[in-house]
Amino acid sequence: MKNETMYFNDLLSIWLEKQKQARALSTYVKYRHLADRYISPYFRSIQLSKADLPLLQTFRNSLLSPDSLHPLGNGTIRCILLLVNSILRLSYETGQTNGILYLPPRLPKKRPEVPVFTLQEQEQLEHYLTAHTGVSEAVIYLGLYTGLRVGELCALRWENIHFSDRYLHVRHTVQRLTRLDTTHKSELILSGPKSISSNRLVPLPAFLLPI
């Protein structure tokens, strides 16, 4: 039923609650952060009936502005626009608006050069790791030769390491998430993988076993 006095942020709160029930905690925290930081302040005094295409385009342009004190990356901007589009779709599905408004999320692609170790740098790192044996060094070695993400490495337990069959069972990840309270502090969260493919068996090189 259409509510003529509903504000955009009222629907934003409803949308966030739906995401809280349907998404992984890490995904919800990310959405909540983007909503609180970028979406809610802009639409604070805007009624849904006033959220027309020119207003939405102005919002999009504000995200793209190079004059911003802290310019956003294209990935962040694209995610914000997708969230706004999802909220606009909910507005239509619940009968608050008569049509679906849409903000194009496609942006010019930036291809930053990804720094990688040179062969000499990798040899220097391995020489150091071999000379300084410890938990931290072993974890770096694992990351270097298994390709595990930092969160996956930190979440490894002894029962995930199968020495006789020489493989690792990646079952969890650790993430540092912002707490959803007034302190805005962060906490470490152990969770399962986001996708089936992330729950996987990774070969363990034989030369790493003595480490």
Q: Whereabouts are the PLM-identified features?
A:
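Conserved hydrophobic/aromatic pocket- or pore-lining residues that grip, position, or stack substrates
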Residues: 39, 56, 84, 125, ...
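Generic recognition of well-ordered alpha-helical segments
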Residues: 10, 14, 33-37, 58, ...
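N-terminal DNA-binding recognition helix of tyrosine site-specific recombinases/integrases
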Residues: 34, 38, 46-58, 66-103, ...
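Conserved tyrosine-mediated DNA breakage-rejoining catalytic core shared by Y-recombinases
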Residues: 119, 156-211
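Basic, Lys/Arg- and aromatic-enriched nucleic-acid-binding interface segment
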Residues: 74, 78, 93-150, 154-156, ...
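N-terminal DNA-binding module of tyrosine recombinases/phage integrases
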Residues: 1-50, 54-57
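Hydrophobic (often cysteine-bearing) scaffold residues that line and stabilize catalytic clefts
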Residues: 4, 8, 24-27, 31, ...
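Helix-turn-helix-type domain boundary/helix-start signal
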Residues: 21, 46-49, 70, 115, ...
